[in-house]
C-alpha cells in the first residue's frame, strides 16, 4: 500500500512540476533607429560609408545553491537536499565600426526638401527650366544657353533688324523669325484658326474630344448634348440627358429618354408625357395613336397592333383557317386522321380543333376504322384492290388507295418520275438538274453530282472541300486558295505552283500557277507575285531606268536618307554634310567658337558665338561691334543696341530687352496684354484665388464668381434647402416629404421607392431604388421586390437573392424558411410549396412515419394483397405487394422502416454507456484522493530550524538560501542581521519562526504576489528581494510557501539578467558585493540547517510545518 501511495505522490509531483511556468530571458534594447533623410525617385546613387553602431556582449556569473529532489526517504517527506550550480547572465554594450551603404543624389543633381533629386544648372536658367545638368529648356520668346536673351516684340534676326509678320497676337522666334502662335491659331503667320480637332499654340495638340465635342483654348472638352466625361466618350446613361448629362429623366413603364433633350420615348402600348398611361381598348402603338383594324370581332396587341386571330388568319383576321388548322392564327394542326389526303372528308373545328369524322371512321379522334384493313363499304363486304406494299391504307368508306410517298396510281402500282415525289407524286422536286442526278421519292431531297451541294445542288463546294456532296477535304497547303470541287485539284496563290502549291515560281515567271513571263530588262528579275521588276540600288521605275529622287536610296529607292543637314549617296545612303555640320547623319553642329565645313576655323568674337557657316559674330543682348566688345549706350537696348526705350503702361521695363517688369493689377504678359490666368489675380497675378474648385474669380479684386448651385465668399457653400441656380435665387418645387431638391438644376431627387416629377408616386411593380429606375432582378414570375432595397420576395418553393433556386430537400414555403416534418427521404418527399409529405409506396401517416397495414401496399396503401395470402415463398411487401422473398426489392420498405426506428434506440444506448464510464472514472479518482490524504496525515516529520552566521570576508554572497523557502533574501546591513540572531525576539518563537497569528498577518501582506514568481519557485529576482527587505521574519514567512519546486523552474531565474545593466545603476539596485556570485562552497555564507529537539518544538509550529510539507 505504501508503494502505491509513493507512486501516486511521484505522479502528482510531475504534474505539478510540468505546470510550473518558465521564464524566458528578457533583453532590453535601448538603441533607437534614426529617421531617414535619403532621397528617392530617379537619379539616386548608392555610396559606401563608415558609421558607429552598438553590440551587446554577454557576461556569465556562476552561482552555487541548495535544492531539493525527490527520493525514497519517507522521513524527509520524500524530498532530499542537494547542492547545485547555476549561471546568471548580464549584458554590456560595446561600440563598433560598421560599413553602411547610403543613398544620395548623383553628380549634377541636388536634393529637395521633399527628398527628390533635380538637375542643377549653374548659373540658373533665367527664362526657362533646367531639364538636365547644365542644360536649360527656354520659355517661348527666349534663347541662349541660359535663356537670358530675347528680341523685342515684333523683331527677330541679327540685330533684331527684321520685323515679324505674324497675326492674331502671335510673336516670333528671336533667332529664326518663325511665328509662335498663341493658343487656337496655326499657319506660317498664325493666320488660320485651329480646326475642331486641334488646339493649343500652332494647333499641334490633338483635341481628344469625341462625339461632336469641341476643345476650348485650354484643351478642355465641351461636350455636345447627350455626351459626358473628360473626352465626351460616355454616352449619357439611361435616365440622364443634356450637356454633360447633368439632367435626369423621369420616364415610366420602361420608356427610354432622348439623351439630348430629355423627351420620353414611350414603348408601344403607352402614352403620356412620362409614358405613364396604357393604351385604351382598340388602340395601340407608340403614343396609342393608332387604331386596331381587326375583323370578325377579333382584338389586337396594344404594343404592335397585330391582330390576335382565333379561328382566323390574315393581317386583319379576314381569312378562315385552312383544312386541318385551328387556334391562334391557325397555327395549330388538327390531329384527326385522313386530313393529310386531298380526297379525305375529315375536318376539325377552326377554333377548338375538335375532330369531325368522315364516313368509315369513328372515335373522338376519328382514328378508329369501322371495317377491317382489307375491307371497305357500308357493310364492309368489299375487298380493297391496292398494292399492299405501296399503300398506306385503303379508305374504309370508298376503297380508295392512299399511296405511300413515291408511288401513285389507282392501286398505287406506279413509282414517281425523276423530278416528282411525295404522296401520289404530286410534289415537284426543286433540284438544279444540271448539277443533280436524282431526288428522294419520299422527301424530295436532291442527290448532287460531285462538286455541288445545297438544297437544290445549285451551290459549289465550300473552300477546301470537293467530291460528291462535298464530302472530301482538299489537301492543299497554306499557299493554296482551295481546290476544284469535282476532282480536288489545288488552286495555288500567285507566285506558287505544284500539286499542293509547294514550289516557288521558276525564274522569269510570276502570277497564278506561274503562267506569266517577266518583262524586265536583261539581268533584272521580277516579283513572283506581281511581276514588278526588282530594281538594283539607286534605280526605280517599271523598267528600273529612273534614278532615286532626293531623300531616298538603295534597291528600288525604297530606303529614306537620314541626313539632317546634307545629302546622301543614291546607292549607299552615305551623307555629305553642309558647312557647319558633321557626323554620320550631319546632325552635329560645330562647338562654340568654331565654324566652317570641318568646324576647324575659330570665331573672331569676344565672348560671343558666331555663324556656323560664315563665322560672323552673333552679339548677345546689350553688346555691339564687329567683335561684340562694346556695351549699349543709355536709353538703348536689345540686339546690337538698336532698340530705344518707348513710353508704355508698364511700371518698369528690362533695360536689355524692353520687357515689362511690373504689370498693373489683373494683367500679365511681356506687354501686360493678357488677363491673369485662371485662379490668380492682383499685382503680377501673384495672388491665388481663394474660391472653391470649379469657381473663378475677378482678375483685379479676386472676388469669387460662383457657379449655379453655390454661394458664399469662396463659393464653397451649397444653396440652402429650397433654393437653386445662380446666386441661389430660384425657389425649388414642392418635392414630396423625404425627397430633396438638386441645388444646381432644381429637379426633385426622389428617395428609394418613389418616382415622379415631385416624387409623389410609389414605384411601379417590378421597379425599385432612387427614382424607381432600377428593375427588379427576381427571376420569379411575380417580379416582386422591396421598393427601397430591391430585395426579392420569393414565392413558396423558391429561395436565393433572385428567387432562382428551388428549396433544398427538407424545406418549403416562401423563401424556403420552413422545415419539413416528414419522416425522411427513405420514406417520403416534401412538397416545397406547401410542405405536405408525399409518402413513398408502402408508407402512410401525416409524416409518412408508419408502414402500410398488413395485407395492404402501394401509394397511400390503396391496394390489397390476396386475402388468402401470396403463396409459398412469397410475402406481401408494403411497397410492391406480393413478391418472392429472394427478390432484391422484396422487404426493402420494412428494412427502411426498421432502420429509422432502430437509430433512436442505438442513440439512447450510446449515452447510457458514456455516463456509466464517467461515473466509474469519478469513483476511482475519489478513492485515490482519500488514501493520499490519509497517508499524509500519518506522517509526523521534524520541522527544521534555520540559524544565520555572518560571513566575515564574503559580502558578495550574502544571501539566504534554503530549499524549503520560496524566495531569497539579501542582507546589506550586517548589524541588523546580527541583532536578529542575538535573540531580539522577546516572547516569540526562536530562530525567526512566526506564531500562527504572525503568519496569518504576514500572508495578508504578501497576498497577490505573482504565483509564477514566488509560489512555485525557490528563488526570486535580486531586484525584488532588495526591494522587499531582508529581515529574518520575512525569510521565515517565506519558508512556509512552495516546498516542491523543480530545477527546471528555478534555472531560468538564475540566468535572468537585469534590465538596468544597460544604463547607469538604479538607486534601488543591488551592488556587486550583494550579488549571488560565489563559486567556492567552503566559503559559502549561507545559513546552517539543523533539526531541534521535537520535545522543545512549539506544537503549533510543528503542526504548521507538517501541513506545509505536504501542501
From Swiss-Prot:
Gene3D superfamilies given in the database record: Laminin, Tie2 ligand-binding domain superfamily
Reported tissue expression: Expressed in engulfing cells and syncytium hypodermal cells. Ced-7 is necessary for clustering around cell corpses prior to engulfment.
Consequence recorded when altering residue 448 to Y: In e1797, n2000, and n2092; increase in corpses in L1 head
Chain segments carrying region Interaction with trim-21: 931-1007
Comp. bias (Low complexity): 1030-1039
Region (Disordered): 940-993, 1006-1111
Modified-residue entries (Phosphotyrosine), positions: 1019
Sample GO molecular function, one term: scavenger receptor activity
Cellular compartment(s): Cell membrane; Cytoplasmic vesicle, Phagosome membrane
Ranges in the topological domain labelled Cytoplasmic: 932-1111
UniProt note: phenotype after gene disruption: Accumulation of cell corpses. Appears immunocompromised resulting in susceptibility to bacterial infection. Reduced or lack of association of ppk-3 and rab-7 with the phagosomal surface. Defective in the recruitment of lysosomes to phagosomes. Double knockout with the P-granule component pgl-1 results in an increased number of cell corpses in the gonad as compared to the ced-1 single mutant. Conversely, double knockout with pgl-1 or pgl-3 results in reduced somatic cell apoptosis.
Motif NPXY location, chain numbering: 962-965
Short sequence motif YXXL: positions: 1019-1022
Main location: membrane
Coiled coil: none
Modified how: Phosphorylation of Tyr-1019, within the YXXL motif, by src-1 is thought to initiate phagosomal formation. 'Lys-48'-linked polyubiquitination by trim-21 leads to proteasomal degradation.
Extracellular membrane side: 19-910
SMART domains reported in the protein's UniProt record: EGF, EGF_Lam, FU
Membrane topology: Single-pass type I membrane protein
Membrane-crossing residue ranges in chain numbering: 911-931
PANTHER family, alphabetized: EGF-LIKE DOMAIN-CONTAINING PROTEIN, SCAVENGER RECEPTOR CLASS F
Protein name per its UniProtKB record: Cell death abnormality protein 1
Taxonomic lineage from the root: Eukaryota, Metazoa, Ecdysozoa, Nematoda, Chromadorea
Recorded name of the encoding gene: ced-1
Amino acid at each position: 500500500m505504501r508503494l502505491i501511495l509513493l507512486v501516486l505522490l511521484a505522479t502528482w509531483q510531475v504534474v505539478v512540476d510540468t505546470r510550473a511556468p518558465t521564464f524566458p530571458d528578457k533583453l532590453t534594447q535601448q538603441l533607437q533607429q534614426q529617421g531617414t533623410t535619403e532621397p528617392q525617385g530617379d537619379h539616386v546613387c548608392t555610396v559606401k560609408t563608415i558609421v558607429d553602431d552598438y553590440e551587446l556582449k554577454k557576461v556569465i556569473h556562476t552561482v552555487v545553491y541548495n535544492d531539493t529532489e525527490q527520493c525514497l526517504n519517507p522521513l524527509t517527506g520524500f524530498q532530499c537536499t542537494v547542492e547545485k550550480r547555476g549561471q546568471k547572465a548580464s549584458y554590456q554594450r560595446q561600440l563598433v565600426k560598421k560599413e553602411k551603404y547610403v543613398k544620395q543624389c548623383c553628380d549634377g543633381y541636388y536634393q529637395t526638401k521633399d527628398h527628390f533629386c533635380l538637375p542643377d544648372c549653374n548659373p540658373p536658367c533665367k527664362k526657362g527650366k533646367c531639364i538636365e545638368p547644365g542644360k536649360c529648356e527656354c520659355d517661348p520668346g527666349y534663347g541662349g544657353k541660359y535663356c537670358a536673351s530675347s528680341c523685342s516684340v515684333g523683331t527677330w534676326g541679327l540685330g533684331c533688324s527684321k520685323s515679324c509678320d505674324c497675326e492674331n497676337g502671335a510673336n516670333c522666334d528671336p533667332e529664326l523669325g518663325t511665328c509662335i502662335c498663341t493658343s487656337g491659331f496655326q499657319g506660317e503667320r498664325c493666320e488660320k484658326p485651329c480646326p475642331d480637332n486641334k488646339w493649343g499654340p500652332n494647333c499641334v495638340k490633338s483635341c481628344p474630344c469625341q462625339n461632336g465635342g469641341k476643345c476650348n483654348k485650354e484643351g478642355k472638352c465641351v461636350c455636345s448634348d447627350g455626351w459626358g466625361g473628360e473626352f465626351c466618350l460616355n454616352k449619357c446613361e439611361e435616365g440622364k440627358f443634356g450637356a454633360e448629362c447633368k439632367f435626369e429623366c423621369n420616364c415610366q413603364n420602361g420608356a427610354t429618354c432622348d439623351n439630348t433633350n430629355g423627351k420620353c420615348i414611350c414603348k408601344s402600348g403607352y402614352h403620356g408625357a412620362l409614358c405613364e398611361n396604357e393604351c385604351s381598348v382598340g388602340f395601340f402603338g407608340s403614343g396609342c395613336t393608332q387604331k386596331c383594324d381587326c375583323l370578325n370581332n377579333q382584338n389586337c396587341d396594344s404594343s404592335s397592333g397585330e391582330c390576335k386571330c382565333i379561328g382566323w388568319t390574315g393581317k386583319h383576321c379576314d381569312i378562315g383557317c385552312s383544312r386541318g388548322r385551328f387556334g391562334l392564327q391557325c397555327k395549330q394542326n388538327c390531329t384527326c386522321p385522313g386530313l393529310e389526303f386531298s380526297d379525305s372528308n375529315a375536318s376539325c373545328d377552326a377554333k377548338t380543333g375538335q375532330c369531325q369524322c368522315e364516313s368509315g371512321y369513328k372515335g373522338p379522334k376519328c382514328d378508329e376504322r369501322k371495317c377491317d384493313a382489307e375491307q371497305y363499304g357500308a357493310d364492309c363486304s368489299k375487298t380493297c384492290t391496292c398494292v399492299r406494299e405501296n399503300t398506306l391504307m385503303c379508305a374504309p368508306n370508298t376503297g380508295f388507295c392512299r399511296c405511300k410517298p413515291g408511288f401513285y396510281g389507282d392501286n398505287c402500282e406506279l413509282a414517281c418520275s425523276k423530278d416528282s415525289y411525295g404522296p401520289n407524286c404530286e410534289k415537284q422536286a426543286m433540284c438544279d438538274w444540271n448539277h443533280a442526278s436524282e431526288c428522294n421519292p419520299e422527301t424530295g431531297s436532291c442527290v448532287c453530282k460531285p462538286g455541288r451541294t445545297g438544297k437544290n445542288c445549285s451551290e459549289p463546294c465550300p473552300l477546301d472541300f470537293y467530291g460528291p456532296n462535298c464530302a472530301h477535304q482538299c489537301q492543299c497547303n497554306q499557299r493554296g486558295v482551295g481546290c476544284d470541287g469535282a476532282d480536288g485539284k489545288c488552286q495555288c496563290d500567285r507566285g506558287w505552283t505544284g500539286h499542293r502549291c509547294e514550289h516557288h515560281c521558276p525564274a522569269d515567271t510570276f502570277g497564278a500557277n506561274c503562267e506569266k513571263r517577266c518583262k524586265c530588262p536583261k539581268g533584272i528579275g521580277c516579283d513572283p507575285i506581281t511581276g514588278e521588276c526588282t530594281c538594283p540600288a539607286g534605280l526605280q521605275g517599271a523598267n528600273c531606268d529612273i534614278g532615286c529622287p532626293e531623300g531616298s536610296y538603295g534597291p528600288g529607292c525604297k530606303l529614306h536618307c537620314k541626313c539632317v543637314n546634307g545629302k546622301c549617296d543614291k546607292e549607299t545612303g552615305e551623307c555629305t554634310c553642309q558647312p557647319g555640320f558633321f557626323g554620320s547623319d550631319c546632325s552635329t553642329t560645330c562647338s562654340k567658337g568654331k565654324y566652317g565645313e570641318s568646324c576647324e576655323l575659330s570665331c573672331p568674337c569676344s565672348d560671343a558665338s558666331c555663324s556656323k557657316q560664315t563665322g560672323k559674330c552673333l552679339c548677345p543682348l546689350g553688346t555691339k561691334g564687329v567683335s561684340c566688345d562694346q556695351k549699349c549706350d543709355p536709353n538703348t537696348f536689345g540686339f546690337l543696341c538698336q532698340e530705344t526705350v518707348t513710353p508704355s503702361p508698364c511700371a518698369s521695363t528690362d533695360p536689355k530687352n524692353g520687357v515689362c517688369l511690373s504689370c498693373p493689377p489683373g494683367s500679365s504678359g511681356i506687354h501686360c496684354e493678357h488677363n491673369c490666368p485662371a485662379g490668380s489675380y492682383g499685382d503680377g497675378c501673384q495672388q491665388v484665388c481663394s474660391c472653391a474648385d470649379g469657381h473663378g474669380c475677378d482678375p483685379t479684386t479676386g472676388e469669387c464668381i460662383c457657379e449655379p448651385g453655390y454661394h458664399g465668399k469662396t463659393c464653397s457653400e451649397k444653396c440652402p434647402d429650397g433654393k437653386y441656380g445662380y446666386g441661389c435665387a430660384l425657389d425649388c418645387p414642392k418635392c414630396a416629404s423625404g425627397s430633396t431638391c438638386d441645388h444646381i438644376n432644381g429637379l426633385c431627387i426622389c428617395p428609394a421607392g418613389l418616382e415622379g416629377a415631385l416624387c409623389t408616386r410609389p414605384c411601379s411593380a417590378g421597379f425599385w431604388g432612387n427614382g424607381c429606375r432600377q428593375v427588379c432582378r427576381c427571376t420569379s414570375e411575380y417580379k416582386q421586390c422591396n421598393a427601397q432595397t430591391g430585395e426579392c420576395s420569393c414565392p413558396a418553393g423558391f429561395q436565393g437573392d433572385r428567387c432562382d433556386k428551388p428549396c433544398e430537400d427538407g424545406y418549403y414555403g416562401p423563401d424556403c424558411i420552413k422545415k419539413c416534418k416528414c419522416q425522411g427521404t427513405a420514406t417520403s418527399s416534401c412538397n416545397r410549396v406547401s410542405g405536405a409529405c408525399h409518402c413513398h409506396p408502402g408508407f402512410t401517416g401525416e409524416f409518412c412515419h408508419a408502414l402500410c397495414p398488413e395485407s395492404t401496399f402501394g401509394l397511400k396503401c390503396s391496394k390489397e394483397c390476396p386475402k388468402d395470402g401470396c403463396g409459398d415463398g412469397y410475402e406481401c411487401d408494403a411497397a410492391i405487394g406480393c413478391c418472392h422473398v429472394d427478390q432484391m426489392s422484396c422487404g426493402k420498405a420494412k428494412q427502411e422502416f426498421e432502420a429509422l426506428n432502430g437509430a433512436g434506440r442505438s442513440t439512447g444506448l450510446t449515452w447510457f454507456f458514456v455516463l456509466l464510464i464517467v461515473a466509474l472514472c469519478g469513483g476511482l479518482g475519489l478513492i485515490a484522493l482519500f488514501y493520499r490524504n490519509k497517508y499524509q496525515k500519518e506522517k509526523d516529520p521534524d520541522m527544521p530550524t534555520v540559524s544565520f552566521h555572518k560571513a566575515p570576508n564574503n559580502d558578495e554572497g550574502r544571501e539566504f538560501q534554503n530549499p524549503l523557502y520560496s524566495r531569497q533574501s539579501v542582507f546589506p546591513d550586517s548589524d541588523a542581521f546580527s541583532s536578529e540572531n542575538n535573540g531580539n525576539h522577546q516572547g516569540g518563537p526562536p530562530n525567526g519562526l512566526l506564531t500562527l497569528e504572525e503568519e496569518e498577518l504576514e500572508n495578508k501582506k504578501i497576498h497577490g504576489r505573482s504565483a509564477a514568481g514566488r509560489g512555485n519557485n525557490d528563488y526570486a529576482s535580486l531586484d525584488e528581494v532588495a526591494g522587499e527587505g531582508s529581515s529574518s521574519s520575512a525569510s521565515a514567512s517565506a519558508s512556509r510557501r512552495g516546498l516542491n519546486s523543480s530545477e527546471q523552474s528555478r534555472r531560468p531565474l538564475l540566468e535572468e539578467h537585469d534590465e538596468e545593466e544597460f544604463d547607469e545603476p538604479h538607486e534601488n539596485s543591488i551592488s556587486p558585493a550583494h550579488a549571488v556570485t560565489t563559486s567556492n562552497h567552503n566559503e559559502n555564507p549561507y545559513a546552517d540547517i539543523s533539526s531541534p529537539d521535537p520535545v522543545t518544538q512549539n506544537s503549533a509550529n510543528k503542526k504548521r510545518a507538517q501541513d506545509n510539507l505536504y501542501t
